[in-house]
Amino acid sequence: MNIIITGASSGVGFEAVIELILSGSHKVIALARSQDKLERLLEIAHGLNPDCQLFALKFDIVHDDYEGLQQFIASHFDNRVDILINNAGVLINKPFAELLESDFVEMLQTNFIGHVRAIQALVPLMPSGSHILNIGSMGGFQGSAKFPGLAAYSASKSALHTLTECLAQEFTEQGVKVNCLALGSAQTEMLEQAFPGYQSPVMAFEMGKYIADFALTGSKFFNGKIIPVAASTP
C-alpha cells in the first residue's frame, strides 16, 4: 500500500506512522511542518525497521504548493495513493468571549480547509478501492459532551465530519471510500493543552495503532461514517 499521512511528526500521527512501517509491506509518506520532528521520526522508524520505506517531507497542508507534493509523490509512489490519512490538526483552548475571529480562521484553516486542499490534490491519484481517513474529534461529534474553551476547535472538527459524509457520496463512482474517526482522548501534547493535568486511559501509541489498523481495513466495512473512538469523557 502507498500511504500518506499528515500531521505525522507527533502524537497519534507519529505513532500511526511507526505502526505502518513495522511490517515493511507499505510505503509511507509522512507530512508535517517541523523538519526536526520529521528527522526524529525517520531515525526512530529506521531504528525499528532498517528496511522500512518511509519518506518524510516538510509540508504545510494549508499554505504550501501542492505541485511540489505531487512531484514528491510521483518520485516515490509512481503517482498512486492507496490511503490518505488526514491527521494534521491544531487546538486553541480559550473562553468563547475571548476568541478572536483569527482564532476561528486558524482552526478552520488547519482542521478543515487544509484537508480539503489535500483531498482535492490527491484524490485524482487514488484508484478504486482506496481509502481516505479523516481524523476528527469527539469534540465535534453530535450529541457528545462539550467542554468550555473548545468552541473553535470543536466547530472545525464538526465541519470535517460533515465533509466526510459528503465526499463518500461524491466519490462513489471513483470507488474511493471516505471515513472519519472521531477520537476521544489519548495522552498527547494536544490533550495536555486542552485538559491540563488530565491523564487519559489511552496512550498515544494505542490510538496510533488503532488509526493505522482502521486505515488499512476500515473501508471494507464502512463508508461515509463518523465513528466515535472514546473510552472516557473527555
Predicted regions span which residues?
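Conserved glycine-rich cofactor-binding loop
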Residues: S9-G11
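Conserved glycine-rich Rossmann-like NAD(P)H-binding loop of the short-chain dehydrogenase/reductase
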Residues: S25-L41
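Rossmann-fold cofactor-recognition segment
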Residues: L48-D64
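Conserved NAD(P)H cofactor-binding loop of Rossmann-fold oxidoreductase domains
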Residues: N87-N93
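Substrate-binding pocket helix/loop in short-chain dehydrogenase/reductase
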Residues: P95-F96, D103-V105
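Catalytic loop of short-chain dehydrogenase/reductase
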Residues: L133-A159, T164-E165, Q169-E173
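C-terminal helical subdomain
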Residues: E173, C180, P196-P234
